């Protein structure tokens, strides 16, 4: 994939969020299954990603990335609207495939569009405090949430391929 911009649905708009900073909100009703984003960026391996993350941390910056496959991470181009997509433990978005994100259910105008960050990584060192406020809030989001059978049932195949394979391997261990 090239360093081209990520496409986002025209109804996705940046606004102030109660979850964290700014978020992405629907400016109109979106039916379930509506494609909201097609991610583009630069694919890097895990070693390169760790270097990018360390450099960004040292400079007070941020690297927007998702794990799309084993040892393949998509680093999104800077200044993309999708950067403002906050985590939610009962999200309105999920993956159709590694780089396509759609609505998980019908979304009303003015609702925040969120995605479960744990559907995008198996990196065991990933962990963050959650502020989503949903009834399903886990309090902490991590790169090992995929090990929870209830979590697996909720998302089924709507995760990146690396998470899907980790679940399959774990289930046969």
Would you name each region that the model predicts?
Residues 2-93:
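Catalytic cores of histone-lysine modification enzymes
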Residues 89-173:
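C-terminal SET catalytic tail plus cysteine-rich post-SET Zn-binding segment of SAM-dependent SET-domain
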């Amino acid at each position: 994939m090239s360093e081209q911009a990520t496409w986002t649905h025209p109804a996705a708009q940046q606004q102030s969020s109660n979850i964290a900073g700014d978020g992405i909100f629907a400016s109109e009703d979106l039916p379930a299954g509506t494609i909201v984003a097609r991610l583009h960026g630069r694919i890097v391996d895990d070693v390169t990603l760790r270097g990018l993350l360390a450099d960004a941390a040292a400079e007070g910056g941020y690297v927007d990335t998702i794990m799309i496959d084993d040892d393949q991470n998509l680093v999104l181009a800077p200044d993309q609207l999708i950067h403002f997509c906050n985590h939610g433990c009962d999200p309105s978005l999920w993956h159709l495939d590694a780089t396509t994100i759609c609505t998980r259910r019908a979304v009303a105008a003015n609702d925040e569009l969120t995605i479960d960050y744990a559907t995008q990584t198996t990196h065991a060192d990933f962990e963050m405090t959650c502020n989503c406020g949903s009834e399903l809030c886990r309090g902490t989001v991590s790169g090992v949430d995929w090990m929870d059978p209830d979590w697996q049932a909720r998302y089924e195949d709507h995760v990146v391929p690396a998470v899907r394979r980790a679940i399959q391997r774990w289930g046969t261990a």
